[in-house]
């Protein structure tokens, strides 16, 4: 009997212990292990775009958190923690036009899960601006065509920016596009950069088709081909001049009497200084409307300023023929020397350019001086025309240039560069053979400077690729071994042209690494052609 009572007591005790243990487990299952939380049960917390939300609580053990609904837009910046006072951080990077809710779950070891809700309030539908529309088109084009599109695709872009800021900020922020983004050290010791790629809003003026492929384009201009800023004097006291590189025939500048070499000291009565030089420079070379300027020239005779002369000029929409000047000097020690000043590779003027080479051929020129000092480039097809006419039959069937695109485009070409041949037999833009302008020269003399770039350098490189002797006279060239394929978009009656770098060019020998420029065979500074010592020139800008 005692044995039975003892056993009954033991079983009763064991049952009681088990019941107590089970009761504790049930309590934990109902208990979240969270105290002192900063949210209120049943009330949603508000979260907004780009503002991190922090919630706090005390955890009974280590914990993990997750987004159980709304994970496509709500992000946890903190996903786990340890026992004690804890903070959970959340963020949202996008907006929504309607209210949306996410649920956050916190699981503490050995306890039931807890959850709370966050709500992002909907905003009104954003007004789509013209900038946003053109930025979307530009973004799509750059993703496909930009030579360094791999890095470009990783950028976090703001389509709300103005179209120029959107374009230049994006490409300027990149690091792999060193052939586009040229760095330099300013006078203040800081590093700056220039981009070859650009975007522009085209003027609303009509064009006339003049060749088979390219239109002549009307553009506002004073008719000044280029400007060389020069500082004269001492470092403490000097005058900044705009030295005119040349003027286009029948232009406002030529009609006013301005000539190459004019030293402009005042613009609208103001001296040129470091604060206004950039604005004056671009306003004179690239006016975007009809505007008036009064230019004051310091008249220099025998190295002395003898007076001043004023010119009032008005920009107008015009076609600027890049064939500035050409002639032939005959019978110089048995040579007939052709001379061509060419300011830009404008394919719409290819007929005028080809006419010059036909004239050279008819006059049996034996030597050619090609003046590219102020030629910053243009259409590569026009570079092919010039190079082919110079080399003549020696160029037939040979590679003019070989193009490398971005990796995606190269994959479609089986990673083989795309070759373009010299256009001797057929030049598509004129629909004719170039034999009538073929000079068959063994060498060419090129006048070059630091503004000689792109298609100008392409002519040099392509001719050297077929072993034609190219003699460079002047200063080191720019070093632009890359080219562009532009696209135009019309948005709300405005037309934009986006011109990014899309390829690198190589010659027939596979050489294309001239990003530091071509060094001249004969060095000559045109502001001091005789290399005199102690002259008053300080520097060119």
Predicted regions and their residues:
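Bacterial Sec-dependent N-terminal signal peptides
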Residues: 3, 12-40, 111-132
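Short, solvent-exposed loop/turn segments enriched in Ser/Thr/Gly
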Residues: 48-55, 95-103
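Short, exposed coil/turn segments at beta-strand boundaries within extracellular/luminal domains
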Residues: 108-115, 303-308
């Amino acid at each position: 009997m005692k044995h039975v009572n003892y056993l009954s007591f033991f079983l009763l005790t064991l049952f009681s212990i088990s019941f107590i243990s089970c009761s504790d487990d049930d309590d934990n299952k109902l208990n979240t292990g969270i105290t002192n939380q900063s949210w209120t049960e049943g009330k949603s917390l508000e979260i907004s775009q780009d503002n991190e939300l922090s919630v706090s609580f005390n955890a009974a053990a280590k914990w993990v958190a997750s987004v159980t609904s709304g994970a496509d837009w709500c992000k946890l910046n903190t996903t786990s923690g340890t026992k004690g006072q804890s903070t959970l951080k959340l963020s949202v990077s996008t907006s929504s036009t309607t209210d949306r809710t996410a649920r956050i779950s916190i699981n503490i070891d050995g306890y039931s899960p807890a959850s709370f809700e966050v709500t992002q309030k909907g905003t009104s539908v954003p007004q789509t601006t013209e900038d946003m529309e053109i930025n979307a088109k530009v973004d799509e084009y750059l993703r496909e065509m930009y030579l360094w599109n791999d890095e470009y695709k990783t950028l976090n872009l703001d389509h709300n920016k103005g179209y120029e800021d959107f374009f230049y900020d994006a490409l300027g922020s990149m690091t792999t596009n060193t052939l586009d983004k040229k760095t330099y050290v300013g006078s203040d010791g800081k590093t700056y950069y220039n981009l070859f790629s650009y975007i522009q809003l085209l003027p609303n003026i009509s064009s006339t088709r003049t060749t088979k492929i390219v239109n002549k384009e009307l553009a506002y201009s004073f008719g000044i081909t280029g400007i060389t800023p020069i500082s004269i004097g001492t470092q403490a006291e000097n005058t900044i001049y705009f030295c005119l590189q040349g003027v286009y025939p029948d232009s406002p500048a030529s009609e006013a009497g301005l000539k190459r070499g004019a030293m402009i000291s005042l613009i609208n009565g103001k001296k040129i200084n470091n604060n206004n030089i950039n604005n004056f420079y671009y306003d004179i070379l690239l006016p975007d409307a009809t505007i008036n300027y009064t230019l004051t020239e310091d008249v220099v005779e025998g190295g002395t300023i003898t007076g001043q002369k004023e010119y009032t000029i008005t920009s107008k929409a015009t076609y600027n023929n890049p064939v500035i000047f050409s002639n032939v000097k005959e019978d110089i020690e048995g040579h007939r020397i052709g001379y061509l000043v060419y300011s830009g590779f404008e394919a719409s003027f290819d007929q005028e350019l080809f006419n010059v080479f036909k004239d050279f051929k008819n006059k049996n020129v034996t030597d050619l001086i090609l003046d590219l000092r102020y030629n910053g480039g243009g259409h590569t097809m026009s570079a092919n025309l010039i190079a082919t006419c110079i080399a003549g039959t020696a160029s037939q069937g040979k590679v003019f240039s070989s193009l490398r695109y971005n990796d995606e485009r190269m994959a479609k070409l089986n990673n083989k560069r795309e070759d373009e041949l010299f256009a001797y037999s057929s030049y598509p833009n004129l629909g004719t053979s170039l034999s009538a302008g073929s000079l068959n020269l063994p060498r060419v003399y090129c006048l070059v400077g630091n503004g000689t770039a792109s298609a100008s350098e392409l002519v040099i490189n392509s001719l050297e690729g077929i072993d034609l002797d190219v003699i460079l006279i002047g200063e080191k060239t720019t070093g632009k071994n890359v080219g562009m394929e532009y696209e135009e978009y019309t948005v709300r009656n405005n037309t934009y042209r986006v011109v990014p770098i899309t390829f690198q060019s190589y010659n027939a020998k596979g050489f294309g690494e001239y990003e530091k420029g071509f060094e001249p065979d004969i060095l000559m500074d045109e502001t001091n052609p005789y290399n005199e010592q102690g002259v008053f020139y300080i520097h060119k800008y």
